[in-house]
Amino acid sequence: MTRLQGRGSGPRPKWGTYCLRSVDDGRTWKSHAVIAQDDANQPLNGYCEPSVEVMPDGSLLAALRTEGGMEADQKTGVLYLAQSCDGGLTWSTPRAVNPFGVFPQLLRLDNNIVVLAFGRPGVNLLFNVDGRGERWQGLTLLVNEGQRFTHTSGYTSLVATGADRFLIAYDQFDYPDADGEPRKTILVREVVVR
């Protein structure tokens, strides 16, 4: 199974998020389910940039961003979570987990702690220890407070490196090189979660 995003139709189409499923090792894919789409109550441009992770109980958790609006103060929308307890056939109504965020990334470690990384502003981490994705704690900002609005795209990548640790990669627009000149740089940090 994989996830994707797409736009609806009509005069003001909004983003939606969907699951595709393959039963032939990825040679062909078919529509499996809608995670979230074109909610009439969603004030921005819909749900996009989905990330899906298998939770310790076997359920699926999806993290979704909402597309930012066109107003100057709407640079990013709310970050949402949705859950499936039937292999991704049906999904709960998305619920807000953070008032902002782009490109959410979920990662379950072998110690069953689930990491949620997201950005804009900044690069942020949240941690779930209940195994169900209900309670999140430990909001951590990985860039300097004064740089969180202008010095990173906020897009990240996560990879587990052990039962209680992972690498996070993210960009910084003006990281000083060996001569002190600001350069766009990809940074990687190891994080240990116990």
Regions of interest found by a model, annotated:
Residues 1-194:
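Asp-box/BNR beta-propeller blade signature and adjacent active/binding-site loops
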